[in-house]
Amino acid sequence: DIYGSLLRPGNITVVVARSGVGKTQFCLDFATKVSAQYEVPVLHFDNGEMSKEELIFRQCAAMTKVPVYLLESGNWRKSGKETVEKVRSVFADLKKQYRHLYYYNIGGMNIDKQISVLKRFYYSKVGRGNPLIFSFDYIKTTSENVGNKNEWQVVGEMVDKYKKCIQRDIKNDEGPCISMITSVQSNRTGIVTNRAASNVVDDESIVSLSDRITQFCSHMFILRNKTSDELQEEPSFGTHKLINVKARHLGKDIAGAINQVRMPDDTLRKNFVNLEFENFSITEKGDLRDIAESQLTTTTLLENANSDIPDLDWR
């Protein structure tokens, strides 16, 4: 409702995060849930870092709440009746949510080969004129011979070619057919470990590799862990922040996207979405407006409670 559709045909949505924060999990979780709801196929390109089996176990862990190591080892069968029932109960849902998911390892391929695979898959499996969600994990330099080009030039050309492919090359009479969601690593400015919230940089300056990534995308979000002080102040609002830094299209809740949020201490802050990451399962926990309302309610209750305390000073 705030930022509109993140999977508009012909558009690219980029998630920026440090390594290990959960950008792959977020993109795949979002794409597969949309796929299951609207019956749209998902093509997932992996850049040679995670196997198909690893992703399957992660998604199964997210749906069952059973630790990955139990699933990978097969010990879930020996972990009690409750665990066995949890795993078996989601088999049907797992097949339904991921029956339209296609995995392809493009590690070692140059950008032209990657786009060739995308086009061949689209025309052979999806069919001309039909919608496709394209999940690309993730933007980085390829192994091709780059000559005298800098890293930022190579990455810029990669994003440019993907944009032209989904915007211009593959389309029907009504327009583009492919929606793209991808991710990129942030630079060291985006590190949050051992930092207070006031010292964390939450803007597009943390995007690594090339400024063309920001230029060609329609939506850009920063995904990061909450700092220790944020977790202490916001205990019921998840473990991660999803912060929008660019939005070419907005949803019906425009105020939530562009207006600053007034906090109980009368300061103004940029809105963001709270996410709960637990065992590879992702749940939305409201936005900054919900945090402000919760803190205001708590402050009001404390003030009312203090006003009911009688004055015992008899002097």
Region locations from a protein language model:
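C-terminal regions of RecA-like/P-loop NTPase motor modules
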Residues: K65, Y69-L71, K81, A92, ...
